[in-house]
Amino acid sequence: MAWLVLLGLLLCMLGAGSGTSDLEGVLPPDPHNCPNKCVCAADVLSCAGRGLQDLPAALPATAAELDLSHNALKRLHPGWLAPLSRLRALYLGYNKLDVLGRGVFTNASGLRILDLSSNLLRRLRTYDLDGLEELEKLLLFNNRLMHLDLDAFQGLSMLSHLYLSCNELSSFSFNHLHGLGLTRLRTLDLSSNWLGHVSVPELAALPTFLKNRLYLHNNPLPCDCSLYHLLRRWHQRGLSALHDFEREYTCLAFKVAESRVRFFEHSRVFKNCSVAAAPGLELPEEELHTHVGQSLRLFCNTTVPAARVAWVSPKNELLVAPGSQDGSIAVLADGSLAIGRVQEQHAGLFVCLASGPRLHHNQTLEYNVSVHKPRPEPEAFNTGFTTLLGCIVGLVLVLLYLFAPPCRGCCRCCRRACRNRCWPRASSPLQELSAQSSVLSTTPPDAPSRKASVHKHVAFLEPGKKGLNGRVQLAVAEDFDLCNPMGLQLKAGSESASSTGSEGLMMS
């Protein structure tokens, strides 16, 4: 009996083991397996700085960001990104890639950021970047690029930032932009290259939003008058590329490296450059002024009819028919732009981008729209009411003047105040008499040595004055109070004292 139990247990164990092996054959491999020498964190796969000379054999399908920078990779295999359908960012900087090849990005249609900086790339061919329709940022700086195919960036319709600095490029087509479109591109970095010639008309034809971040500093540009006027105008307009790297914009005065001078600091080199040497380099932007709530329509007037017209709003939104996402801006069938009710958010630079087979190059037109708030209407001023009020006040004042008697108490107060004053009244007859009085004596002042008193001011009445006979003396005391004329004292001299009683004082 014990042997039977042991045999049953052995059979069960064998059955369980065979079932487990069958399940292992049916289940797919774990997609979260992390490659050797790499670090996996959620949707991030980092293999940076591991000394890899070849690509990892198995990559997890959940990776949205893959970092392979700071390794020793020399080649990328076609279709190596096929398992990574969610990939959005790929970093391949600081490797030893000298060529890309056909089909290396075929299965990376969702890629947004591609970093190929600090490698050994010498040439970019037309098919090297195929399959990157959604790419927005491409970093190619610090390579050895000497040549770009005419359509090297063909198909990158969503590219907005392109960095090509620190390479060996001696030319660049600003007319064609090597297959790039103007509708999305906002940053173009060509600094620190070997650009010895640039087409000034092609530069001038670029839209302002691209000029704002077009970096051309640290290039052996010639000290050309037309280029000088163009860059100086950009500098005066305050474009970021010129403002941020003002001192790095240099040119060669004598076509030798030792003759490098700064554009905006050595005016003597350009003293013979007149404005007439570069007429019409840029079409001035049209200034438009409108008010909130009004309607606005902008026309893309090109030299010849354009096959394709697009607009760029002040918020860098690409506007094609039917219009903006919020519906406030419409692009009509003729290519014009219409705004039904202007708001403050519509202020800024509108750029029209026109292209077509009949145009020699893509044309741009710019409208700088200023939106003003409507002035509040002043409150209505009721002139009739104010006129009536003024008439009533004037009538009351006239009636008071005509019929209101003066205040007697006020008169008494005025008289009392006048008595208390210490200066003479101008209309007093006694004061007039004192002013015309004279001092007479029996002894005439015939002696020349006789002097009048220095303490009294006297006046002699004319001899012909009637009624005085030259004998009446009016003497006023020095301490006489002019405010109290009743205290006047008449004093007779020693010789005329007896005659004053009989003859008396005669006043008229």
Curated annotation (Swiss-Prot):
It is found in: Membrane. One of its GO terms (cellular component) is membrane. It is a single-pass type I membrane protein. The keyword Disulfide bond applies. Residues 20-383 are extracellular. SMART domains: IG, IGc2, LRR_TYP. This is Amphoterin-induced protein 3. It comes from Rattus norvegicus. The gene is Amigo3.
